Amino acid sequence: MALAVALSSPSLASADDLAALSRDFWIWRAATQPITRDDLPRADRPHGWAPDWSAAAVEGRRTRLASLTARWQALADARAPTARQVDHRLLGSGLARVRWELDGVASWRRDPGFYVDQTVGAVVDVLLPPPPFDRDRARDLVARLRAATDILTAARANLSDARAPFARLAIADLDGIGPRLQTATAAVALQLPPGSAPTLGRDTEAAVAALEAYRAWLQTRVGAMPEEVAVGREAYLRFLREVALIPFTPEELLAMGRQELARAVAFQAYESARDRGAPELPLVPDQAAQIALAARDEQAIRAYLADKSLLTVPADIPRYVYRKLPPWLMALRGFGEETDFASLSRANEGSTRWIPAPTKDLGFFALSMAQDPRADTVHEGMPGHAFQVALGYRHPDEVRRHWYDSGVNEGLGTYAEEMMLQAGLFDDSPRTREMIYRYLRLRALRVEVDVQLALGGFTIAQAAEYLQSAAEVDARTARDEAAGFAATPGFAIGYVVGKLQINALLAAAARQQGPRFRLQEFHDFLWLNGNVPLSLQRLELLGDTSELKALDGQPRIP
């Protein structure tokens, strides 16, 4: 939607009307937003909810989207305060995401794995928060198991444009799903209130039968499906401009990623030379030790942020804690993230990172967490996602309490890694500094992978091979990342592109404010508004419309 449309209506936009639209939109999204493997879009689903992708439900989404969009367009007003203009554009991004889901990436028509997420992933979504399991959660679990048959029936009707690489991934994911789902529900049954789910066993068996039949159905059809998974340049640009509000072309994104990759590789080389002879990081002895170490580290990071005047951390912000990966989640590893960032209704509960037992054969990120939890905590916990979303849940402006796009969130998490590195948090651990540069290297490589997958320059297999060789990660991590990024174009660029946008925003603020610039104040604004795309933060903080004009097709002025 052009900036001129969004900001030129003669009618005066009402803040109350915009807030009402936001409430209506997010209530609707809680009932219709797809389950994904991204840990940031935490929705408060209605009790008893289950995904519905029947033809009637899809048509209902289109009808409701049109109604909400008309209300949004009627609230455009160039004379409204800047904060209201930002909120209006932010809600426009949310509406654009629904259009992207339906007609852009269109996973419900193209990706058989989408329905694995709506079934098995929906079960993981119920199991992810820590115990206790009350009767409401028991009913939610049963509702999602019972919905599997109808969801997978709808899948067969909907997948008119299914792509073979996605189908092969879904077939592989569902291999052995019966014992895995049975193990998960049997384990969680021991946690449920007596009598709260008397049909759990039968419901599990019915879901297993539906999933196994779906897998068999895919196996009979995958050979006739097209191999191409790219969404194409036009759709990708639409995502950047309307959903993520990122004002760059694919070619500019590639240049940014490659420059950041060169920087990360160079700095990793400098660090390795500096650290020659330093001992390797040992594994923690067990999960209990890892949990205790992570708790001490999280507290120390809070103190460090205050001591260095980097960021204000309210004393009552809930903790980011490690917990032992329970058997019900262990059985379903790979079907969802293993971090629970709570939600608006659970804002006081804090965030949980579920951890497996520390062994040398863990994947790239889990292994680093078992060596020095701080490397994970600064991105995922404090001052990263867990802290950012906790602040977001408290935002005085209710429009900004929700997740819209991961570009700013992941950019902030990546920025936090490097901020803490440069601020000296890891001065006591040379190998952890190297680890952070390895993280930055992988995140830079993700830009290339994201763009090339979206434009057709990489197959999923080529993307995985590229990540494994260039980032030096294990094969499973590379495969999972490539598959996930192919299914969610535009997601993987956010880590580096968001970080670079933050760097540019900081530099512009320092230049504009001169001696009045305070890093802590800048960070406090940035973190509080961590759900707001950085092109909108630039408008609000600096009064700079250049990035929004670029989104609307007007040339940027350097």
What do these predicted regions represent?
Residues 1-9:
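Bacterial N-terminal signal peptides
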Residues 12-558:
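N-terminal maturation segment of proteins
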